[in-house]
Amino acid sequence: MKIVECVNLNKTYRQGQVTVQALRDLSLQIDKGEFLAVAGPSGSGKTTLLNMIGGLDEIDSGSICVDGKTLEVMSQAQLADLRLHKIGFVFQAYNLIPVLSAIENVEYVMLLQGLPAGERREKARTVLDDVGLKGKYNRRPAELSGGQQQRVAVARAIVSSPAIVLADEPTANLDSKTGQGLLEMMQAMNTEKRITFIFSTHDRMVMEYARRLVKLKDGRLVDDEFKSNSAHS
């Protein structure tokens, strides 16, 4: 079952007099439950592709369908609702709210969804336990290591069991041991909960864990490999 379908995507950014074509006629289908990495050099279009799948960037031309919804015909309010209920984001820089504790950061999405306080707290505790942060519920981001902050970010992304998690360079600021632990945790969630994970990455380890590796160059899809020997699959 397709959960993402991109057809002939084009995206151009303009910075002053400079025009950069980030995506060029890119087409890609992703099935529910995939664990997929998008690789390529800087400027190849990886982050742009994730942002467009997440409805954060407008499409110049082409079409994107996510979980049965055609993004280019949706209003900003409809896109925000899709992100809130169907898509989890993990950012390279964590993007945690510094004045909130770990558990409050995780609860925030559910607060926007209108869940009762007791249910929010129970779900947030459970998912923080799942990512190895039991007992650190009340720590603020500045009191956590980089690896712990990224685990809070993952917990926030998956607490509502989204259909898709989009992870932009999730291991870039982590040492190899912490990065491996994070990947194993997300791989387990993919297997157990059937959450679709889509990564953008330069990290060879992420590519090794992925069950499918898509490569971009100059905004074009240049390779698409399904792997039978991904790490710990």
Where is each model-derived feature located?
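ABC family nucleotide-binding domain
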Residues: 2-216
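H-loop (His-switch) and adjacent beta-strand-loop-beta switch element
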Residues: 213-226
